[in-house]
Amino acid sequence: MAQVYNFSSGPAMLPADVLRVAQEELRDWQGLGTSVMEISHRSKEFIQVAEQAEQDFRDLLEIPSNYKVLFCHGGGRGQFSALPLNLLGNKTTADYVDGGYWAASAVKEAKKYLTPNVIDAKITVDGKRAIKPMSEWQLSADAAYVHYCPNETIDGIAINDTPDFGDAIVTADFSSTILSHPIDVSRYGVIYAGAQKNIGPAGLTLVIVREDLLGKAHVSCPSVLDYSVLSENDSMFNTPPTFAWYLAGLVFKWLKTNGGVAAMDKINQQKADLLYGVIDNSDFYRNDVATANRSRMNVPFQLADSSLDKLFLEESFAAGLHALKGHRVVGGMRASIYNAMPLEGVKALTDFMVDFERRHG
């Protein structure tokens, strides 16, 4: 079978080693004669899987002991509702930083529960899209919390600053950048991430929440979104997505075996440098994000002649480079190069790009 590299933004590529283990264990897990998908989430065997996955996740991000880790349903969009329902309390507003598509989506959902103070952080620097430094964000004094998205998958924009807002409760959607670089978890009240990019398959959402923020949910908050209920029940208030949880655990083990988050950080920088280098050294390709705010996870790029887009996608697919079509909102191309994408995959893409330019430029 020819080598295929999947550049999908999510559900995304999983590590080959993880898929191999899952395949080997699929029909007979740990000698039980059944699949891990078939055993009770309350069995001692699955409890062991769940506890080990949480511990490995804590180790990878060095999560302080005063934070709870929740394995949830609902995806990132579910957390758009969970945040105000759990954190608003008796306040009526929260600060929402708009840096792109997903941050704006969080604002739209939040309006069902509060009146957001929207901070438009989008700016232009030398004709390229960028984000205001955090020091220029105008937070309000009466906000229940501040929310932002550190990495915008569609726009290819990253916010790399570490938040330092005093006593403000900082919440963040880390869906597309979790585990790709070190995070100072202590700077946040809530971190959440859909699993389908850097953690595992779709269907699982991880939430890291500071313990002092528990117990404040609105009376109308659905139990499946209530952080306290989930914490008190070890994320098993209802049946969790057990297979996704198991696979996430395999990914965490793979990360630890391969040097952890620090090693991923270095490799991800190498991959991004290689791809952006080809784009920047060409008049055939372009990226319209300022260097300081370029995403290392999602690299959108345009061809100078858009009439070649269809051919580029056809030829790249035939070459084993899949899912390079850009999001419908921005068009063009997009290469998502999460942790599971090896450097060899990015090298294969850049070699193809150089050759395509030679033939059609």
UniProtKB/Swiss-Prot annotation:
Pathway note: Amino-acid biosynthesis; L-serine biosynthesis; L-serine from 3-phospho-D-glycerate: step 2/3; Cofactor biosynthesis; pyridoxine 5'-phosphate biosynthesis; pyridoxine 5'-phosphate from D-erythrose 4-phosphate: step 3/5
Protein's GO biological process: L-serine biosynthetic process; pyridoxine biosynthetic process
Class of the enzyme per the UniProt entry, highest EC level: transferase
Domain of life: Bacteria
Cofactor binding note of this UniProt entry: Binds 1 pyridoxal phosphate per subunit.
GO MF annotation terms: O-phospho-L-serine:2-oxoglutarate aminotransferase activity; pyridoxal phosphate binding
Pfam families to which the protein is assigned, alphabetical: Aminotran_5
Enzyme Commission numbers on file: 2.6.1.52
Keyword Cytoplasm: yes
Cofactor entry: pyridoxal 5'-phosphate
Gene Ontology CC: cytoplasm
Principal location: cytoplasm
Reaction catalysed by this enzyme: O-phospho-L-serine + 2-oxoglutarate = 3-phosphooxypyruvate + L-glutamate; 4-(phosphooxy)-L-threonine + 2-oxoglutarate = (R)-3-hydroxy-2-oxo-4-phosphooxybutanoate + L-glutamate
Amino acids binding pyridoxal 5'-phosphate: 76-77, 102, 153, 173, 196, 238-239
Keyword set, alphabetical order: Amino-acid biosynthesis, Aminotransferase, Cytoplasm, Pyridoxal phosphate, Pyridoxine biosynthesis, Serine biosynthesis, Transferase
InterPro entries: Aminotrans_V_dom (IPR000192), Aminotrans_V_PyrdxlP_BS (IPR020578), Pser_aminoTfrase (IPR022278), PyrdxlP-dep_Trfase (IPR015424), PyrdxlP-dep_Trfase_major (IPR015421), PyrdxlP-dep_Trfase_small (IPR015422)
Gene3D superfamilies linked: Aspartate Aminotransferase, domain 1, Type I PLP-dependent aspartate aminotransferase-like (Major domain)
Subunit composition and interactions: Homodimer.
HAMAP family xrefs: SerC_aminotrans_5
PANTHER family documented for this protein: PHOSPHOSERINE AMINOTRANSFERASE
Protein name (Swiss-Prot/TrEMBL): Phosphoserine aminotransferase
The species this protein was found in: Cronobacter sakazakii (strain ATCC BAA-894) (Enterobacter sakazakii)
Lineage, uppermost ranks: Bacteria, Pseudomonadati, Pseudomonadota, Gammaproteobacteria, Enterobacterales
